[in-house]
Amino acid sequence: GVQTCALPIYFNSEKAYDMLKKLNINPNDKLKTMSKGTKEKVQLILVMSREAKLYFLDEPIAGVDPAARDYILNTILTNYNEDATIIITTHLISDIERILDDVIFISHGEIALEKTVDEIREDEGKSVDSLFREVFKC
């Protein structure tokens, strides 16, 4: 699921309606009639329309088709508050690696690695996805 944290939270309905329109999603449609990918997009639109200092996105691209993944990642990149921090939990590292600045690997509740993407590439000589697979034996 997608969540956000901030007090107070300001919701920009104009931004939300604009994103819905770009995707040809009728704001009057019921969620139960939408596909999983469309529901994920609507959830993300609702989150990214908030003016928050911290966005927590829990597996935002899990279980959606590649086109929906691209839309979700582009929505994250183009609609968040630039003064905000975005925390993304995911197992789909290769799909989000291009948008990452910093990486934390957590194993059994402990931090296994904490580096910038550039440090991983320079120090380890590999992609974040390759290092993830190595650390977690995927």
Predicted regions and their residues:
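A short, surface-exposed alpha-helical micro-motif characterized by mixed small hydrophobic
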Residues: 96-98
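Catalytic Walker B motif of ABC-type/P-loop ATPase nucleotide-binding domains
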Residues: 55-59
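Conserved H-loop
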Residues: 84-92
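Short, small-residue-biased leader/transition segments that mark boundaries at the very start
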Residues: 1-7
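Helical segment within the ABC ATPase nucleotide-binding domain
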Residues: 69-82
